[in-house]
Structure formats: C-alpha cells, structure tokens
Amino acid sequence: KGANERYCCDLEKVKKAIAAVKQGLTSLHPGDISTTQNPIIFRPEQQAAIDKTKKVFRRGNQMLWNAKMRFGKTLCALRVARDLEMKRTMILTHRPVVDEGWFEDFGKIFYDRPDYHYGSRTKGESFKALEYLASKGDRYVYFASMQDMRGSELVGGKFDKNNELFSTSWDFLIIDEAHEGTQTELGKAVIEELTKADTKVLQLSGTPFNLLDEHSEDEIFTWDYVM
C-alpha cells in the first residue's frame, strides 16, 4: 500500500526529486532544498583549527581538537573535509543520536557542492548508493555508530556485518566525542581496522584527557571558553 502523506513544495523541487529517483538516490542534496544558504564565516579560533589541521595533514595523519562545547567542531571538521577534497569521509561516534546534527551541518558546508553526499542508516543515502556515486567521481560523508561497528565479527564482535565499511579505503576518519568508547579493546580494534596507511584521523573532544598522550603538541588544537 502506498504512502498518502502530502507535502507543500514548488514545481522545481518536484522536478529535482523525480530526477533524483531516476538516478537511484533516496534524498535530495541540501543545495536542491534550500536556495537561501550563504557560506559560513568562521570565527578566528575556528579558522585557526581548520588551518592548523590542514597543515598537519600535509605531513602527518593524526590530529586532536581539544575544544569545549559551542566551539563548532562539527562544522569545522566538515570544512576540513571540503577544503582537502576528501573523497571518502567517515564520521564515527559513540553517540548515534548526533546523526541529525551532522546531517544538518553537512547541508551548511556542502550546500553548493552537489558532488558531495551524506549517508547513514537513517539519513541521506545508503552506503551502497554512496559507493556507486563515488565510482562516478563524486565524494561522500558517511556517519557510523561505534556501538554498531564494535559488534562486527571482523573486530571481535558477535555479528557478521559492516564488512564493506571496514574494507573501504577511507581518506578521512572523524571521531566525534573521541574520549568515549574508543579506549576499549573493541573500540581500538574498530579504529585500527578503519585506518588505512593514508587515512587522515581527526579526533574531536571537549575532555580528551585519555587521548592527550597519544599526540604530539603539534597535533593538538586547544580551545576553552576563556581563550
């Protein structure tokens, strides 16, 4: 039985939705939904984090942002992905509820880049669709739950799942709330399996006390409310 929901929209969005379905997509790109988006002007401290990370990634693969809440870590991390033209980016977090926030911020950063797509189990495109788009030259950001990834047989879990995620050559791995769920045996195994030789890893945390020893001073950006 078909759905009977009705939504108000203009003719152009209907045309774009039909075109998206013909391409095998399950959602419109954020740029096709809103026509009022403007580029985000980052605060000086945010731009400093972005610039330092790009500089570090030119010679290394690891970066940690020690930044308190309200800094804007999500937007800034996505800006790094955009500036460096990352083809395959994974967002890994112990808090799957933040998928909505990442999806919204993706639209703010990539609204004018139709070659970038977002996917997760609940938002945007499926992983299969994203890989198809990547095979055509597009780029994507995929959101994954640490809890789900830890359950995979490949890293010592109990379920035969996520093999396609682990076998993907990720260009960029963003670990959100990196102080949570990453220091257990399974958590470390997940990160190790996802991180290939050339994968850039950016860890985000407001309280990264269990992570500081893993990074050199040059690989850490710090921001607090009093700075």
PLM region spans:
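SF2 helicase catalytic motif II
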Residues: 146-149, 161-203, 207-209
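Short basic/glycine-enriched coil/helix segment immediately N-terminal to the Walker B
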Residues: 59-61, 135-139, 155-172, 196
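Conserved Walker A/P-loop ATP-binding site and its immediately adjacent core
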Residues: 74-110, 148
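Interdomain hinge/linker at the junction between the two RecA-like core domains of SF2 helicases
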Residues: 217-227
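Inter-Walker segment of RecA-like/P-loop motor cores
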Residues: 111-155
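Conserved pre-motif I regulatory segment
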Residues: 31-66
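Non-catalytic accessory segments flanking enzymatic or RNA/DNA-binding domains
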Residues: 2-40
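Walker A/P-loop
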Residues: 58-80
